Amino acid sequence: MDEHGMCQQLVITGGLRTSRDFVKAIAMGADAVAISSAALMALGCQRYRICDSGKCPIGIATQDPVLESRLDVEKGARRVANYLETTANELRSFTRITGHDDIHELSLDDLCTISSEISDNTGIRHA
């Protein structure tokens, strides 16, 4: 998009869970990443996949007072905060390790792969 003079921001979401996933997405051109499932897992989600029913047995995706009482909000908030802080620390470390001051300086040059298929399709150098 940049090569064609397009001024759009690219936010990647879906299947991103770890700082490694986030680094790859940003190095490949994403301006930001969005997380949802990973944060829900940190909160305590057990992936019953019934969020839309309002009957989440963990108490996350419900308005039922009995089910809501099962969620320890303080404990869940600490786990989400720990996940986000650890992720941020890992992103800062990777940025420094690759010789950059800003995560948005990352590029394909900072990545490598052992997969010929990935290399052929993404421009990431083959290790």
Each predicted region: which residue ranges?
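Short hydrophobic "strand-cap" motifs at the C-terminus of beta-strands
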Residues: T13
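Alpha/beta catalytic cores of nucleotide-metabolism and tRNA/nucleoside-modifying enzymes
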Residues: M1-C7, R17-V23, A27-A127
